[in-house]
Each structure stands twice: as structure tokens, then as C-alpha cells.
């Protein structure tokens, strides 16, 4: 069979061929590893941000997590990064696979006789596990095998590879990497690692085209999406997914019940296990890395939703609830879950066990229906682990702030610590058009408490299908939430990024501030609205305060005038009485113990010196010299005492 994965790739000529800021550069980490008797050189992407010098000396570059770029032309697709790794394990086989039919692309494709724009780029043999084999990263981890995927992840996360293997083996983290999506760069989802974000894209019956969805994919990953879900429900579902997979450097997730429903012309009661199973295999063969399966929506749970304000708001959940009621039978997803596990184990597809009964309003948060489903999901998680299949668990939804953390607690208790993946949650229902904000508040809160991945919400939530600009807004908003949680949890490198920004801000290094921003374009555009000239990029003020009222400039002047004396006072005072009495931390991020700070007496002494100087924020050179001499005399006298 012919593998055309490395043919015809080229650097794109559009905006995706450039870094998001001139100070950014692609700076990969390289490592040579041995795996299954073969040697591989890993090249793990990172962005290096060059910084200008400070008045006190040079600044080290800041390195941040990224996906690889620039990418190939979208009509040709990406190279198969993992193809050789998969082949080296010698536990997969190529086979013909199911024959694609036009109904896979929907009824309109059947009428046209073809999809609207067939994929003509790179193609590969379809792979599956050999008879009796399991090819999941969890299986390898449980056998004590460290794969190139695990090595790659460890370099990305700046951690020991054994930590990665142990977390995957225990089910507390997943590496979603279908063997038929070798273009994807290994990444890990788990509470012990950096918080990840997912971006949803996909067409609907009334809007969007294949090219638009591919552009959304590239745009989302450019701005930092760690995974992308294709939630297409309109035309050309199969072909749209093929274009997306062949161009995606990140894992792709789907909700296969959407496509299965299209195959029965949108009539939920006409769904069958056979149609759903065929759809799942179709998507496994294409390379989908994780699938949302609403197997926790069971017939006995549906009546629990009748008293809700907003009922069942999950599309997948409502489809399965409708099927259960129409047939008065248990869900075919729940009944056939073990067969799904067997299928997923052949391709290394991860479960994203869907919260089909999640609350759609804060009035319905944490009710019996939601938690009955979550407990069932816990049961299914442990069943999937028996097949070495990776699992993450989906969570709400709409939850007021005071009720958020119990969701983490119940998920950890019932689901054995499997990664939690939540949609927000939105913490209030009153802000249509701003639900990226209402949800980002809940997202930061729940991630701080242990959630591993956050599904973004765009400004169009509840209002319409997001466009390209909405996708970027959603991604950046959720990068803020994820990073804030990482800072709170103390993940390596998280605080250093903030510190670099704070230092650049205090030193008025405007270009560095833009470069260190999650969205450099917007940061610079806002600055330049009022101060567009290049000299303003070195000015020690912005348009908010102007030159006379900039607090940071005033602080710098104080340091210039009193810096040596302040340092000496900090070095000689060991009592920290005021700080200790108040139970406050000392200077810096360490505890009070062992940290020098100003005592109450020292503070009064410095305040008196400030008053003696005429309570002036600014002193000329002679005045500053006179004050410094007085301070030195008093310090000497204090030392003699």
C-alpha cells in the first residue's frame, strides 16, 4: 500500500506560515529515544519568546507550550509524525476497511452523487490491531513500556517520563492518539499536567462549508487549542472530518451519534445499535482520537429530568433519551458498552464519556439526574479500563460558583480519578453574548480543583454557530482560565511566564509585553489606539494614566532614590514583627519563616524619612544624595546601638 503522507507538503503561503509575533520563534526540544529496537529523534515544538534587555542586564527568553507550525497547505495535509513509531511496535495490520458510501456524508450527498469537495490530499493505509493485540497507550503503560508518545509528552510537560507512564497506566491521564491519525502530536490530559483546552468546530444544517471548518481548525490550533472536536451535523460530515483529520496536529474528538442520526434522516427512534456501531468503526478508521459516548443516559434516569427548568440540554443526551422512551428499552449504548471497548482497543480511541444529563441552567445544577448519570459513568470507566481503553469523563454545564467543587469531588470518587473534562461551567445564566466570560469564571475555578481539560465556550453560545473570530475569542478566554489554574496548582513554568510579563510591564518594555501576551495582536492594537507612534513603545506610561500619574513610574523613581537604603533595611531587620503578627507571607512567594521584611518600627522610620524629605515623590540628585547621607549616618548609629 502507498503512504503519501510525506508527499507534497509545503509551508503555507497564508497567515498561518508566520509566527503570531515577530519575537516568537519555533524552537523545538530534541531528544533521541530507543523504542522497540529502533531509534527515533523526537522534535517537540515550543515557542521561544525573545526579550529585550532590562536596565540591570539581559533577560532569558521565555519558552511556552505550542503545537508545531507552520503547517502544510490544507489541500495536501500534514506529515505522519507517528507513522514510524506505530510501525515499529509490530502490533498493527493494514486492511481494506469498511467501504465508504455517500450516506456517510448525508442525504444531500446521496442526491448529488458526491460530497461537495472530496479530499484529494495525503492518504494512508487503514490500520487496526492484530488479532489478540491491544494498541492503546494505557496497555503499553501497564506493561511497563515507555513509548515515543510518552517520551514526547514528558518533554512537552517538562517532567519525568516515568510520571507520564504511571499516570496513564493508572487511568489518571490519557494520551489520545488513534493509530489512524499519525499526524497528531502526542499530548496528555490529566490533573497532574498542564490544564488543556478544547475548541469545538463543525458545520450545521444551515451554515458553513468544508473549507470554513478547516480554517477554524487551523485558527484554533494557532491560538492554542490543545484538542478540537468536530461537531458537524450538516452536509458532508464524513468528508469534512477527513479534511480536518488530515490537517490536524492535535487530537480530534467527535460525537458519533450526530452522524448516526443523519443516517436515519434525523429520526431518533429509527437509530439502531448496528447503525451506530458502523458509524463508530467508520470514524475509528478515519483517525478520530476520542469520541463522546452518552452511555450514562439510561432509561430509569430520564424521568428525573421532568421537574427541571431546562430539561435535557445535551443534543446527544436528548437523542438517547428520546430513543429510550420511544422503545421503552435500556440504552443500546449502555447495553453494548463492552463491544465499544473492544472496538476502541483496536485503534486506541479514547472514551469521552458524555454528560447527556448535564444541567442547562444553574437552577438544575447538581440534581439527581446529573449525579445518577455521573455514578453510572464511573461504573463504565472501570469497565473500559478492563480493556486497557483510555477514558476521560465529561462534566457540566451550568453550576453556580458555590456548587462547583463538589463536581470534582464526586467525579474523583466515582470515576477513579479519570481526567475530568468540563464545559465551563457557566456560573450564571444572565449574560447571552458574554457566556465565554460566565463560563471562564467557572472553568478557572473547577480546573484549580482538579479538572484536567476545559471545553471552550464562545460569545455565540446559546445564540448561533461561532465564526472564526468567535473561535479565537473562545480559545484565548479559555487559555486564560487554564493558565490561571496552572498558576494556582504550581505547574512548572506557569508562574515564570507571569513573572516575565510583570517585569516587562514594570520596565515599560512594551514590545515584550505584546510578545508575552496570549493575544499579541489585540494587546498591541489596544495600546496603539491612543499611542500609535513608535516612540510610545519606549515611553514610561500609557494612555490610561498619562506621564504624570503612572504608578509604576512613580515606584521606579522611589526605587532610584531610596533603593540602596531599602535593601539595607530589609537585610538588617530580622524581626518581621508586623508581618508575623498579621499572619501574612513575607516578601516573595515563600512563607514568613526565614524571610526578611520590614518591621513596624522600620516602616515608621522610613515614613519619617519620607516626611523629612518634604513628602516629595521626586527628588533631584542633590536632594537624594543628602537624604542618602542622612540614612547612612542613622544606620551606622543603629549598628553601634
Curated annotation (Swiss-Prot):
Region span, Disordered: 1-25
**Where, by residue number, does Zn(2+) bind?**
398, 462
Q: Which InterPro entries match?
A: ThiC, ThiC-associated_dom, ThiC/Bza_core_dom, ThiC/BzaA/B
Residues reported to bind substrate: 200, 229, 258, 294, 314-316, 355-358, 394, 421
Q: Name one GO biological process term.
A: thiamine biosynthetic process
Its keywords, alphabetically, are: 4Fe-4S, Iron, Iron-sulfur, Lyase, Metal-binding, S-adenosyl-L-methionine, Thiamine biosynthesis, Zinc
Q: In which pathway does it act?
A: Cofactor biosynthesis; thiamine diphosphate biosynthesis
GO MF, any single term: 4 iron, 4 sulfur cluster binding
Question: What EC number(s) would the UniProt record show?
Answer: 4.1.99.17
Which positions in this protein are listed as binding [4Fe-4S] cluster? 542, 545, 550
Cofactor binding summary note: Binds 1 [4Fe-4S] cluster per subunit. The cluster is coordinated with 3 cysteines and an exchangeable S-adenosyl-L-methionine.
Q: Which cofactor does it need?
A: [4Fe-4S] cluster
A Pfam family annotated for this UniProt entry? ThiC_Rad_SAM
From the UniProt record, list the reaction(s) this protein catalyses: 5-amino-1-(5-phospho-beta-D-ribosyl)imidazole + S-adenosyl-L-methionine = 4-amino-2-methyl-5-(phosphooxymethyl)pyrimidine + CO + 5'-deoxyadenosine + formate + L-methionine + 3 H(+)
Domain of life assignment: Bacteria
Polar residues bias (residue ranges)? 1-12
GO CC terms in record? cytosol
- Note the coiled coil stretches, chain numbering: none
Family, per entry: Belongs to the ThiC family.
Checking NCBIfam families in the record gives: PRK09284.1, PRK13352.1, thiC
The task this protein performs is described as: Catalyzes the synthesis of the hydroxymethylpyrimidine phosphate (HMP-P) moiety of thiamine from aminoimidazole ribotide (AIR) in a radical S-adenosyl-L-methionine (SAM)-dependent reaction.
Q: What is this protein called?
A: Phosphomethylpyrimidine synthase
What is the organism field in this record? Answer: Corynebacterium jeikeium (strain K411)
Q: Which lineage is the organism of this entry classified under, starting from the top rank? A: Bacteria, Bacillati, Actinomycetota, Actinomycetes, Mycobacteriales
Amino acid at each position: 500500500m502507498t503512504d503519501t503522507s510525506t508527499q507534497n507538503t509545503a509551508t503555507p503561503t497564508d497567515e498561518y506560515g508566520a509566527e503570531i509575533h515577530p519575537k516568537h520563534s519555533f524552537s523545538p526540544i530534541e531528544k533521541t529515544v530507543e523504542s522497540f529496537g529502533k531509534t527515533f529523534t523526537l522534535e517537540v515544538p515550543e515557542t521561544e519568546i525573545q526579550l529585550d534587555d532590562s536596565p540591570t542586564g539581559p533577560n532569558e527568553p521565555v519558552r511556552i507550550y505550542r503545537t508545531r507550525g507552520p503547517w502544510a497547505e490544507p489541500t495536501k495535509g500534514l506529515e505522519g509524525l507517528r507513522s514510524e513509531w506505530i510501525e515499529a511496535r509490530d502490533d498493527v495490520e493494514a486492511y481494506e476497511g469498511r467501504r465508504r458510501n455517500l450516506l456517510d456524508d448525508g442525504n444531500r450527498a446521496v442526491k448529488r452523487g458526491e460530497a461537495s469537495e472530496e479530499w484529494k490530499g495525503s492518504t494512508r493505509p487503514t490500520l487496526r490491531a492484530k488479532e489478540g493485540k491491544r494498541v492503546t497507550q494505557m496497555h503499553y503503560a501497564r506493561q511497563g513500556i515507555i513509548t515515543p508518545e510518552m517520551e514526547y509528552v514528558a518533554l512537552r510537560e517538562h517532567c519525568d517520563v516515568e510520571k507520564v507512564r504511571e499516570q496513564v497506566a493508572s487511568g489518571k491521564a490519557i494520551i489520545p492518539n488513534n493509530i489512524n491519525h499519525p499526524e497528531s502530536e502526542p499530548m496528555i490530559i490529566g490533573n497532574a499536567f498542564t490544564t488543556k483546552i478544547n475548541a469545538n468546530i463543525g458545520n450545521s444544517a444551515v451554515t458553513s462549508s468544508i473549507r470554513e471548518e478547516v480554517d477554524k481548525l487551523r485558527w484554533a490550533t494557532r491560538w492554542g487549542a490543545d484538542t478540537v472536536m468536530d461537531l458537524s451535523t450538516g452536509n458532508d460530515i464524513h468528508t469534512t472530518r477527513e479534511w480536518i483529520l488530515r490537517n490536524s496536529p492535535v487530537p480530534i474528538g467527535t460525537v458519533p451519534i450526530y452522524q448516526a442520526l443523519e443516517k436515519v434522516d434525523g429520526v431518533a427512534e429509527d437509530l439502531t445499535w448496528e447503525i451506530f456501531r458502523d458509524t463508530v468503526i467508520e470514524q475509528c478508521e478515519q483517525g478520530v482520537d476520542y469520541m463522546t459516548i452518552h452511555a450514562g443516559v439510561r432509561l430509569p434516569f430520564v424521568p428525573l429530568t421532568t421537574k427541571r427548568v431546562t430539561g435535557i440540554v445535551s443534543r446527544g443526551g436528548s437523542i438517547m433519551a428520546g430513543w429510550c422512551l420511544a422503545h421503552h428499552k435500556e440504552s443500546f449504548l449502555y447495553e453494548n458498552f463492552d463491544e465499544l471497548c473492544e472496538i476502541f482497543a483496536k485503534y486506541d480511541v479514547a472514551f469521552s464519556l458524555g454528560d447527556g444529563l448535564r444541567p442547562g441552567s444553574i437552577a438544575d445544577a447538581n440534581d439527581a439526574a446529573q449525579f445518577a448519570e455521573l455514578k453510572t459513568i464511573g461504573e463504565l470507566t472501570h469497565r473500559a479500563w478492563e480493556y486497557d481503553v483510555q477514558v476521560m469523563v465529561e462534566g457540566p454545564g451550568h453550576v453556580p460558583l458555590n456548587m462547583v467543587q463538589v463536581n470534582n469531588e464526586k467525579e474523583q470518587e466515582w470515576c477513579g480519578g479519570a481526567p475530568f473534562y468540563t464545559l465551563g461551567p457557566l456560573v450564571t445564566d444572565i449574560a447571552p453574548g458574554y457566556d465565554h466570560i460566565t463560563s471562564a469564571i467557572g472553568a478557572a475555578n473547577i480546573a484549580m480543583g482538579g479538572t484536567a481539560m476545559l471545553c471552550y465556550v464562545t460569545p455565540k453560545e446559546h445564540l448561533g454557530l461561532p465564526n472564526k473570530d468567535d473561535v479565537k475569542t473562545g480559545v484565548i478566554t479559555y487559555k486564560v482560565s487554564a493558565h490561571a489554574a496552572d498558576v494556582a496548582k504550581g505547574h512548572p513554568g506557569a508562574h515564570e511566564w507571569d513573572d516575565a510579563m510583570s517585569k516587562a510591564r514594570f520596565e515599560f518594555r512594551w514590545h515584550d509585553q505584546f510578545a508575552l501576551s496570549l493575544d499579541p495582536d489585540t494587546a498591541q492594537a489596544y495600546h496603539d489606539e491612543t499611542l500609535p507612534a513608535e516612540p510610545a513603545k519606549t515611553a514610561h506610561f500609557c494612555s490610561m494614566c498619562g506621564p504624570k500619574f503612572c504608578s509604576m513610574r512613580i515606584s521606579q523613581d522611589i526605587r532610584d532614590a531610596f533603593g540602596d537604603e531599602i535593601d539595607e533595611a530589609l537585610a538588617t531587620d530580622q524581626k518581621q514583627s508586623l508581618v508575623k503578627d498579621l499572619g501574612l507571607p513575607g516578601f516573595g512567594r515563600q512563607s514568613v519563616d526565614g524571610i526578611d521584611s520590614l518591621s513596624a518600627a522600620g516602616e515608621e522610620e522610613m515614613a519619617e524619612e519620607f516626611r523629612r524629605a518634604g513628602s516629595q515623590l521626586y527628588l533631584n540628585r542633590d536632594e537624594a544624595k543628602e537624604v542618602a547621607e542622612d540614612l547612612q549616618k542613622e544606620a551606622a548609629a543603629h549598628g553601634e546601638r
